[in-house]
Amino acid sequence: MAKKVVGIVKVRIPGGEATPAPPLGPALGQKQIQIAAFVKDFNAKTSKMKGQLLNTYITVYEDKTYTFVTKGTSTSTLIKKKLGIEKGSGEPNKTKVATINQKQLEEIAQEKMAYMSANDIEAAKKIVAGTARAMGIKVE
């Protein structure tokens, strides 16, 4: 019989660098998960992705065990890294902070493809382009 899920915790944690400090510690503490054990497991599994901010989904079961899945770096983080900018625009419809071309969109889409609901690279590029526009980045 399957274990009963009592909660799912969604956090963004740097790969290989998880610590019991906020936001992770309080989020897991509320679900009564052994924080030190999770940190050790997470850092071991994500050591090759050191420093990348990973979207992580932690499923907590009734017997206080857990499983976790990492979904890669957020699209906005990849766009900022690719364009070398600190942050998006505060007024995306009025102020453009950078320009992204089709080649850059495709590179980001290739990297995110495994975590997206897109069926092909063109659909993934459209998703990435939408994120870029929402950040105040002009899409060429």
Curated annotation (Swiss-Prot):
<comment type="similarity">
    <text>Belongs to the universal ribosomal protein uL11 family.</text>
</comment>
<dbReference type="InterPro" id="IPR006519">
    <property type="entry name" value="Ribosomal_uL11_bac-typ"/>
</dbReference>
<keyword id="KW-0687">Ribonucleoprotein</keyword>
<comment type="subunit">
    <text>Part of the ribosomal stalk of the 50S ribosomal subunit. Interacts with L10 and the large rRNA to form the base of the stalk. L10 forms an elongated spine to which L12 dimers bind in a sequential fashion forming a multimeric L10(L12)X complex.</text>
</comment>
<dbReference type="InterPro" id="IPR000911">
    <property type="entry name" value="Ribosomal_uL11"/>
</dbReference>
<dbReference type="InterPro" id="IPR020784">
    <property type="entry name" value="Ribosomal_uL11_N"/>
</dbReference>
<comment type="function">
    <text>Forms part of the ribosomal stalk which helps the ribosome interact with GTP-bound translation factors.</text>
</comment>
<dbReference type="InterPro" id="IPR020783">
    <property type="entry name" value="Ribosomal_uL11_C"/>
</dbReference>
<dbReference type="InterPro" id="IPR036796">
    <property type="entry name" value="Ribosomal_uL11_N_sf"/>
</dbReference>
<dbReference type="InterPro" id="IPR036769">
    <property type="entry name" value="Ribosomal_uL11_C_sf"/>
</dbReference>
<dbReference type="GO" id="GO:0003735">
    <property type="term" value="F:structural constituent of ribosome"/>
</dbReference>
<keyword id="KW-0488">Methylation</keyword>
<dbReference type="Pfam" id="PF03946">
    <property type="entry name" value="Ribosomal_L11_N"/>
</dbReference>
<keyword id="KW-0699">rRNA-binding</keyword>
<keyword id="KW-0694">RNA-binding</keyword>
<protein>
    <recommendedName>
        <fullName>Large ribosomal subunit protein uL11</fullName>
    </recommendedName>
</protein>
<dbReference type="GO" id="GO:0070180">
    <property type="term" value="F:large ribosomal subunit rRNA binding"/>
</dbReference>
<dbReference type="GO" id="GO:0022625">
    <property type="term" value="C:cytosolic large ribosomal subunit"/>
</dbReference>
<dbReference type="Pfam" id="PF00298">
    <property type="entry name" value="Ribosomal_L11"/>
</dbReference>
<dbReference type="GO" id="GO:0006412">
    <property type="term" value="P:translation"/>
</dbReference>
<keyword id="KW-0689">Ribosomal protein</keyword>
